[in-house]
């Protein structure tokens, strides 16, 4: 998700009524509707109810949170399943311990009234991206699913300016846009977009946003309590989407705008109802996808990549 309308640092602290265990959670970006269960758990007192004082920190650099967890500088970080596979192969001691958003959000984004009606129309066109590696593999899979390859298009690094690059005509499409944000952002700005969903264009389904911990140092009991609180928060969100939006928006003035209201409505159905539960096949399939794409040298066992912390 690439937005610039909010501040890049945001911290919420619960006030302990009794002696509580302190936990540090690094977000993947500034606070936004993707983080709904976390903010609701904080605002509704669900963390305090399980004796946790959770410090929620947004990073100055979105690439830092997994590294900080690996280095023992944070207990948990929000990250992305595709990146986790690569980071483990790079030697970072990380493991998925929970899921926040249980579906892909990534999409191939084009102008709704533009010339790209199917991904096959990208032949000879420019496609913007912000992060190499996984996004290139995702794009390659989409192109091959539609009879093309990366050789048929021109890749343009637009950094984090995905929708601006598309709306300005710098590129004909962008990969890495989040369907719950960029589509709404473009519509609000009067330039409607259209998403080709990666899971419908040749990609295996995956968990977009996950929680990662250091398997060598993590406190399983504390993390289990954290997920008990966020699961309760997710149930509240699903049962009371409007009331929960009001609680979420009231937590910070920056959240009280049309973009976040729209994104909230689009994100609610995608939150993991059982954050600790995991699909072993999903992680095995994506590991195989990355290996086939040549991004990893060998296949790790799923037990290395992910775990259910509630299982003894």
Regions found by a protein language model. Give the residues of each.
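Short helix-capping segments at alpha-helix termini
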Residues: 46-49, 145-150, 189-191, 221, ...
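Secondary-structure end/capping motifs
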Residues: 219-295
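N-terminal signal peptide c-region/cleavage motif recognized by signal peptidases
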Residues: 14-16
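Pocket-lining segment of extracytoplasmic ligand-binding domains
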Residues: 82, 161-251
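Sec-dependent signal peptide recognition
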Residues: 1-9
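Short, glycine-/small- and polar/acidic-enriched structural segments
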Residues: 21-158, 163-164, 168, 172-180, ...
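Periplasmic-binding protein-like
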Residues: 100-110, 191-215, 227, 265-267, ...
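Conserved C-terminal helix/tail region of periplasmic/extracytoplasmic solute-binding proteins
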Residues: 284-312
